Amino acid sequence: VYVSGQVPMVGGVLAETGAVGEGEGFVSPERAKELAAVCALNALAAVKSVVGDLDRVERVVKVVGFVASDPSFTGQPGVINGASELFGDVFGDAGRHARSAVGVVALPLGAPVEVEVIVHVRD
């Protein structure tokens, strides 16, 4: 199952907006990591809506994370760890995956983080 990019929506509302960076006026890397976990939860909800039961997930194949970043920010992998750690918590070894973490200028709706996922499911 290929899940399109998920942003940190909670109750239909974007949980936070802005670029990730250090200092005032930016989303902190710690907060962005939490938001990446929210993106991962939203991705799991999308998978469940298609396959009916998350027990059908054999493994998480790949995660691609995008982080709207201040030009001097280079901690994108640490931010996307929020998603990776959640998949590990939910699926154990089956949650281990290939991953990319990319810094970008902006994301849809002003989101600080976006996560897309590929999972392999049983028939």
Regions found by a protein language model. Name each.
Residues 1-123:
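Short, polar/acidic, helix-capping and beta-turn segments at strand->helix junctions
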